[in-house]
Amino acid sequence: LILKTIIQKMNIKLEDTVIYGTSAGGFLSIIMGIYLKGAKVVADNTQLDVSNWAFISAVDYVMEYCFDNIGTALKYPERFNVVEAFIKYNYVPKIYLHVNLCSKVDNSMQLAPFLEKIETMKNVTEYNNIEVILHYEEKKGHDGLSQEEAIKFLYEVLDK
């Protein structure tokens, strides 16, 4: 991975690395956390199963653009669902999952199915804890942490 090479050339240990993203970027951050073993992940109001995203037309477009058709895409469930990726790569990175309770779409279409599916993950042997951090911010909905809040939290994670 290019990112892993850059981190190593900067003489940074993966254990001292935090990958951060919100929404679809949170999904990608979790996937990168699988590839960068030892790094921590902070994901905010993230998609955990892209195929269950509220904006299904966007998902359809990605599947058609990247895979030509849905049938081909279904051969790679680990590219759309983080639990499937955990199972395929036998690894769960340390994840801090921020969820706004006021984002009903994130809770009903992402968090609840994720928690149900993760219960089926019995054979994954390299497992780090996932901390779900619930907050209640009515006006924000799906919007993530502010830049200041995110930076503060990232430093807290690095200090742990």
Where are these regions (language model features)?
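The feature captures the conserved acid-bearing segment of alpha/beta-hydrolase catalytic domains
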Residues: 58-133, 142, 151-159
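Alpha/beta-hydrolase active-site loop
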Residues: 1-12
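Short coil/turn segments at beta-strand junctions that form active-site/ligand-binding loops
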Residues: 15-16, 39, 93
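Alpha/beta-hydrolase fold nucleophile elbow
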Residues: 11-23
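Glycine-rich nucleophile elbow surrounding the catalytic serine of serine-hydrolase chemistry
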Residues: 21-31
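Residue-level signal for short, function-critical loop segments
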Residues: 23, 47, 101-103
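Short hydrophobic segments within beta-strands
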Residues: 20, 44, 97-100
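Hydrolase active-site cap/lid region
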Residues: 34-70
